[in-house]
Amino acid sequence: MSMHPIVDKGEVAIDFPDKYYSGGFGRDCSFEARAEDEGVLIRLVRGGSDKRAVAIHLHHFLFAGIIEELARSLGEREPIDAVHRDPLLAAARGLAAALERSVPKPAG
């Protein structure tokens, strides 16, 4: 597990019929994001006296659908400012490059 500091913030909310959970993860927290055989894992962790952790596993087709919907949504709104756009663009290019170089060879 490779944890990284959160340089911005994240918020999580889970709404069950009889319970509601929410929590924030800021600069004093950390995250993990990794590719797995069946999809991706994203973990947010907060230490200290208010300890909490959340993990989400997204299978590849769901993750692809989420990325596609984000792309559509970004295309329909005003452009994001350069301070936020540049790291998002660099990360998206890195993801694309990693996917293109790791195409498995057909069996047989």
Model regions and ranges:
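Positively charged, low-complexity terminal tracts
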Residues: M1-G108
